[in-house]
Amino acid sequence: MSVPAAAGAARHRRRHVLDLDDFSAQEIDEILETAVSMKEVLGRAIKQVPTLRGKTIVNMFFEESTRTRISFELAGKALSANVVNFTARGSSVEKGESLIDTVRTLQALGADMLVMRHSESGAPYLVAQHFHGSVINAGDGRHAHPTQALLDLFTVRQRLGRIEGLKVVIVGDILHSRVARSDLWGFTRMGALVTLCAPQTLIGPEAFWKATWPDLTITSNLDECVRDADVIMTLRLQKERMEAGLLPSLREYTRFFAITAERVARAAPHCLVMHPGPMNEGVEIMPDVAVSAQSVIEEQVANGVAVRMALLYRLSGE
């Protein structure tokens, strides 16, 4: 069996996926359309097509990951690629080998694509300068997480039928979130109206955001900004921020910024509640909201496989 014909439309010709800042709305649209075809593949009795047979994908994760790593592994295997999972622990990296030397070694071993997560912002960009194949950023420091943003866009469009004109509220630790930055690029590029909501200490100077996204709304009043929202995206509160003195207490944060049923009731009746995971239930989102009919958190996880299949397919040139 092959990939559905719709996925064989004009192919995305870029070599790497490092962030969404240089993606056009048309490029994003093409990826989302390809993901629809890949979701159809995943709905078959045999969830595999031979599209990337003979290709080798190396998942290089220098940070712990469950959703993203497994999602990429499943995506590669569904396309019949050889998937190798690399971890720094026990590798030559622990013996002092540089990142670039490691990449050159993987290249010599025949890797065609690298999927990379790293704690240092910009690490995938550096690797892309030295690797002859394709590099996909699976999250770098607090900089970017483009595939998370793409699966968020896909989930919203699958549920609501469009992205343009929607009111999207992103709540939480904006300042330190790679997801927030990539979601900003994705949702604004596709025509959504985005509001950022966070304590001042977790969002930073308004001028910083407005310089890139002048139409952005920035506030610390969650009760007001969720009114008539189509999408509420809450981010994981990194508890180390409290230790750094950026928050008085978790209880205080939850009081003003947690997604509760009462706050969701202020939003549009069709409002989607989203979270990139992992969640701190009872802190940034209440347990009843996380499993409510309006929550699409599990759908985000499931859709990640189809979206990452679409990216691997389009980058492969097959």
Curated annotation (Swiss-Prot):
This protein's gene is called: pyrB
Source organism of this protein record = Roseiflexus castenholzii (strain DSM 13941 / HLO8)
**GO BP field:** 'de novo' pyrimidine nucleobase biosynthetic process; 'de novo' UMP biosynthetic process; amino acid metabolic process
PANTHER family from the UniProt entry? ASPARTATE CARBAMOYLTRANSFERASE, ORNITHINE CARBAMOYLTRANSFERASE, MITOCHONDRIAL
> What job does the chain carry out?
Catalyzes the condensation of carbamoyl phosphate and aspartate to form carbamoyl aspartate and inorganic phosphate, the committed step in the de novo pyrimidine nucleotide biosynthesis pathway.
Q: What lineage does UniProt assign to this protein's organism? A: Bacteria, Bacillati, Chloroflexota, Chloroflexia, Chloroflexales
* Family matches, as SUPFAM superfamilies: Aspartate/ornithine carbamoyltransferase (SSF53671)
The protein's superkingdom reads: Bacteria
Which residues are involved in binding L-aspartate? K95, R178, R236
Transmembrane spans: none
What's the protein name? Aspartate carbamoyltransferase catalytic subunit
